[in-house]
């Protein structure tokens, strides 16, 4: 997870109806996140040849207050997956901004328990990549830390064609995290995300870490209006 400071004027036009931007200590973030999905099921049914695959997404953070409850969530700007069928299902179920490109991933063990993780995709002739190298053992999330803010968002929101928003719940345990000794995002930011993200994402990240991950359940969405 590579995290970048972003200005409000960049993110405000992308916020779905009924939610507000979520800050950590007064700062707004966008994150470039790589995942490896395993044993994926849609409505409880495994899809042959589509159960294990990587994803790389760009997201930012929002919140919604409902009857005294604060629901912290994410909004995806772009999500890359390696198969068209995966992108099609996600767009149909959640209207998520998925795009299918050739992708690959690698996990390389290093000395003293460290490892390197890489996700790569090919938008044209050249491969571009997101990578990170860990050091030290994993640790629990610290309360009120930036890592906790980035990982502890259990709702997803996205705009719908009629102007409303879709809200869906995501369930997983708290993730342990690894510190990162180096991280790289070698990508044509303008070509992938648009010129508006150049200044915020085409630079050294504010922070980077790697999470262990776990089983994740994504629930059916419901419409939200302001």
Predicted regions and their residues:
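Internal, well-folded beta-alpha domain core
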Residues: 57-226
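Short amphipathic
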Residues: 1-3
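Glycine/small-residue-rich interface belts in oligomeric ring/scaffold proteins
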Residues: 6-58
């Amino acid at each position: 997870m590579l995290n970048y400071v972003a200005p409000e004027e960049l993110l405000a036009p992308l916020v779905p109806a009924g939610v507000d931007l979520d800050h950590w200590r007064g700062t707004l973030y966008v994150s470039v996140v790589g995942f490896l999905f395993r044993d994926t099921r849609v409505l409880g049914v495994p899809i042959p040849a589509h159960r294990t695959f990587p994803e790389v997404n760009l997201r930012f953070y929002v919140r919604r207050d409902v009857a005294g409850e604060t629901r912290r969530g994410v909004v995806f700007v772009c999500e890359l997956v390696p198969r068209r069928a995966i992108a099609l299902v996600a767009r149909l179920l959640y209207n998520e901004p998925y795009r299918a490109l050739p992708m690959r991933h690698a996990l390389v063990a290093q000395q003293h328990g460290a490892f390197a993780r890489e996700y790569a995709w090919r938008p044209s002739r050249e491969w571009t990549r997101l990578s990170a190298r860990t050091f030290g053992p994993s640790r629990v999330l610290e309360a009120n830390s930036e890592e906790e803010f980035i990982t502890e968002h259990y709702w997803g929101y996205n705009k719908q064609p009629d102007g409303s928003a879709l809200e869906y719940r995501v369930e997983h345990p708290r993730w342990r995290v690894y510190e990162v000794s180096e991280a790289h995002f070698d990508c044509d930011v303008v070509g992938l995300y648009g010129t508006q993200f150049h200044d915020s994402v085409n630079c050294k990240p504010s922070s980077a870490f790697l999470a262990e991950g776990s089983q994740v359940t994504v629930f059916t969405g419901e419409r939200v209006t302001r």
